[in-house]
Amino acid sequence: MFGRGPSLLLYVLLIASVAQAQQSTPAAPVVVQPGAPGMPTKTLPANTRGKLPPESPKDVEFMQGMIMHHSQAVEMTALIQSHTENKELRSLGARISSSQSDEMKFMQHWLAARGDPISMAMPGMPEMDMAGRPMAMMPGMLTAAQMRALQDARGAEFDRLFLTGMIQHHNGALTMVKDLFNTAGAGQDADLFNFATDADNTQRAEIRIMQGMLEKTR
């Protein structure tokens, strides 16, 4: 009877080691695919290879156009340092320049990851920027004449032209976001949706700030 002791002990140790191995074996990874806005998520097989969601031509047009749109806003803010001593306007301009420069990098990466060109086609004779480069006109963008007037202004006159121009510019961006979401099949990419929504919220808030600042100049 006592001769069975070692065998029983080995059996117990074997069972314990198997149980421990089972506990230490990591669970198979779960791949969850986010749904489009308003749609449920999907659970995919663990061996699913990642791929970018399909894009709409309007998505590409929106990103390309918004890069050009942001580029002019950054160009406008670059004038502030040498054209006005208004500290509040300088602070606002620095925020706009920083945020829109970062957003341009995001949009360029988004397009490049999908093999799309960064710049949009510009049929016909486009407007020119302050450096004489061709410039596509998106909603709300300042004309070449408006940009020259802004460049020539100083002090309080510059403040007024900058604020009215940037309010116009921001309202154009809101129009672009609205057009994106009003287009069937567009804006379904999660990254694009989040970016466009954040841009809309940010620019609405900045419009209210600039309207308040503009009142002080009158």
For each predicted feature, which ranges?
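Bacterial N-terminal signal peptides
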Residues: S7-S17
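All-alpha RGS (Regulator of G-protein Signaling) helical domain and cognate RGS-like helical scaffolds
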Residues: Q23-R218
